[in-house]
Amino acid sequence: KFQDVKQCQQYIEQRSENDRLVIIVSGQLGQEIIPYIHQLRQVISIYVYCMDKKSYEQWALKFSKVKSVVIDLDELVSQITTDHKIQKKIEEPLSISIFTTNVNAGKSTTGVNGQFVFSQILVDCLLQLKSTEIDKNELINLCKNEYEGNYTELNNLHEFEQDYSPDKVLWWYTKETFFYKTLNAALRTQNIHMIFLFRSFIYDIYRELQKYQSKSLLQVYRSQIMSIEELDGLKNNIGQFISINSMFSTSKQRTIALFLLGDITTQIDSERVLFEIDADPNIATTKPFANISKHSYFPDESEVLFMIGSIFRLNNINRNDDQIWIIKMTLC
């Protein structure tokens, strides 16, 4: 907390460029300091908390990192929470395997393709293995230990134990709780033990996506922050196939996906990416996908969810006028 503008600016400038700072300022202090800190990479978002919204709202429009001008504390907390959720989702790394016939891809194709095949076999095995109450209890206990002292998540765990049923799995997956965080982390890091313990819930997601499988061709979008190294790996494999080794959440609304990227500040070694995906349910795909809006914790998000291990063909990668990389893919 700072009363002095110079001290505040100096503190921000001394932070590492990898730090991510959310700044809350008063209206008067904001007018003094925002012009000097707005361009700093460490600052990802600014909120103006003041008594006179009208006096500062028009002025704040000049600065893209100013997310909102608010007079109510609850509204401020709600806005920061919502924006943080979006930022986390976009920055969460994707686990991608490439199946390539490109001998110049820079790696042994046997090694690269082996990872791709393994990811496919893993999903198929998980869907066939029976689960037991012992495994479910072990998962719950591991999560309780992980979130010890976090009363919000412990309450979520208690509710999960009491009320979970297979038809609620999409609701639980889309709610920002231990369930989403732990499952996604396990899939992203290929933590086989944790994935094994989650297998009954992965099966439940699979069955629900099958039940609500989209019946018509869809074009969907996903905002993503991607490392330059990851992006280069995809650019070197245009025309090849990729497997997404986690649940792949997308939106039917392109304008919203682009808007979210427009507000994001990237790290030095990262780029803003928009996936554009054509998904036709009439092709012989083995992995289901569905519009889960009616079954989601956030029913207004027009979310289309693809099953773990969904395979896409990389069609094209180009940068648009807003310096966003557009990756065009087709579901296989």
Can you name each region flagged by the protein language model?
Residues 1-332:
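Mono-ADP-ribosyltransferase
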